[in-house]
């Protein structure tokens, strides 16, 4: 890496200004202190953290922490526009990721899906040279390959996101946010941001590898080096799958074991009576899940099952019996931020609620006892999208509430069961799932 580029990147990092969002307004150190909030910046190893102490004597809403740098004429990072590339990481597997250049606009989204594709959809801009990323953002000099990557290496409590603005001379604005989503910050309480780190490397790939290694170490990532090999019902039968379809394929794979040495048979969406009532099958699966798992095992395969654990359909027994377990609106009734087939509305289980955590532990413990060794958890991002809703725990962020629910799922399913996360915010899954 050239001394010039390295010194410019060091200037960017050292010039970051720390801010805190209190009741929907951003404050620097001095303005925060004047209002009774002690904001401090520190290093955690090679990472940066911000801490706020509420000394105001009143409860407030904590929007998050921000590191910011700006300077027109490429004042943040001077790399000529024709050489500068921005790598954008997506929030989930269904969010776009890739490289943008000066003159481009951000990736386009279906407006109806935007709230499931971005942590902060209200900040999306289709203007040229305005870009947003989740988890990590990188700046590359495509002439030399040299790269600076900014990424959050912890992610259990808050969502990490980024934005930047380019001009013809380079990066004019850069922002990294550790999002607290309006969680309660009580008088006398302290909250610490997630850890923000920077990685300079001779290539984007090298920077990504260093970031991933550090992120995985800090979050105790689970390591499985042999990917599971199996058959999934979704990609042929979709939601029309029947019990006899599963049995037919089990027999076929048993007869062709040498040609197709699979380990798992996964039943996907289509068996459940309603979202939320996962142990009760519809009429297409007359013998039930326990019986089916036993039939799969007798044939020499491991049973696997699809669920969307945070989603609860409006016609489910779970919603009728426990509406208070859902994320609540201002009238203390369930929010319905999503929809399902045949016009059914979907409420979202509140992962911050201890009763929901107990429900998850019991559900996944039962599935394991019934013989399922693998679960695919789908539509997981819905567990973080609450709109105007509020959590049982007012101090929980969206990220923390989601992870609490996922921790309970892991506890119930056991350390040796394989959990696949699907359409989930990557950061909050690290350390709890085996694949994504």
Model-found features: residue ranges?
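Polysaccharide-binding surfaces and accessory modules of carbohydrate-active proteins
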Residues: 3-160
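Short alpha-helical segments and helix-capping/turn motifs at coil-helix boundaries
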Residues: 6-7, 134-135, 176-179, 249-251, ...
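Short, solvent-exposed loop/edge-beta patches enriched in aromatic
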Residues: 44-46, 55-58, 144, 255-261, ...
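Residues within well-ordered beta-strands of beta-sheet-rich folds
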Residues: 49-53, 194, 230-232, 302-306
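Generic detection of long, well-ordered alpha-helical segments
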Residues: 59, 201, 205, 239-247, ...
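Beta-strand-rich recognition/accessory modules
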Residues: 113-227
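An acidic-aromatic substrate-binding cleft motif
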Residues: 208-264, 268-273
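Aromatic- and carboxylate-enriched substrate-binding clefts and catalytic-loop regions
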Residues: 259-436
């Amino acid at each position: 890496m050239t001394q010039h580029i390295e010194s410019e990147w060091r200037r960017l990092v050292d010039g970051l200004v720390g801010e805190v969002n209190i009741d929907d307004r951003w404050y620097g150190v001095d303005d925060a202190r004047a209002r009774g909030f002690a904001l401090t910046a520190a290093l955690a190893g090679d990472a940066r953290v911000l801490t706020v102490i509420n000394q105001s004597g009143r409860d407030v809403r904590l929007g998050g922490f921000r590191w910011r740098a700006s300077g027109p004429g490429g004042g943040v990072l001077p790399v000529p526009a024709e050489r500068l590339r921005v790598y954008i990481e997506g929030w989930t597997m269904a969010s776009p990721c890739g490289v943008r250049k000066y003159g481009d606009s951000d990736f386009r989204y279906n407006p109806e899906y935007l709230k499931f594709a971005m942590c902060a959809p209200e900040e999306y801009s289709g203007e040229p040279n305005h870009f947003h990323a989740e988890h990590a953002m990188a700046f590359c000099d495509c002439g030399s390959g040299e790269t600076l990557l900014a990424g959050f290496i912890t992610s259990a409590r808050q969502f990490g996101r980024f934005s930047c603005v380019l001009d013809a001379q380079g990066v004019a604005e850069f922002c990294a946010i550790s999002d607290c989503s309006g969680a309660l910050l009580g008088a006398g309480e302290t909250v610490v941001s997630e850890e923000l780190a920077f990685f300079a490397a001779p290539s984007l790939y090298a920077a990504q590898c260093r970031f991933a290694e550090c992120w995985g170490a800090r979050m105790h990532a689970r390591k499985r080096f042999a990917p599971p090999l199996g058959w999934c019902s979704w990609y042929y039968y979709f939601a029309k799958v029947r019990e006899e379809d599963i049995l037919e394929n089990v027999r076929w794979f048993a007869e062709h074991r040498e040609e197709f040495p699979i380990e798992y048979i996964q039943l996907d969406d289509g068996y459940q009576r309603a979202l939320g009532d996962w142990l009760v099958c519809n009429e297409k699966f007359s013998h039930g899940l326990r019986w089916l798992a036993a039939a799969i095992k007798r044939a020499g395969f491991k049973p696997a099952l699809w669920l969307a654990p945070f989603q609860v359909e409006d016609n489910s027994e779970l919603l009728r019996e426990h509406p208070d377990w859902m994320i609540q609106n201002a009238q203390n009734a369930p929010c319905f931020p999503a929809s399902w087939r045949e016009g059914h509305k979907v409420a979202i289980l509140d992962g911050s609620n201890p009763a929901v955590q107990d429900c998850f532990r019991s559900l996944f413990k039962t599935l394991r006892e019934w013989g399922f060794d693998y679960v695919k958890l789908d539509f997981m991002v819905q567990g973080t999208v609450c709109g105007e809703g509020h959590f049982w725990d007012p101090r929980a962020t969206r990220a923390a509430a989601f992870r609490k629910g996922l921790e309970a799922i892991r506890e119930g399913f056991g350390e040796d069961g394989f959990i696949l996360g699907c359409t989930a915010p990557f950061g909050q899954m690290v350390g709890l799932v085996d694949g994504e």
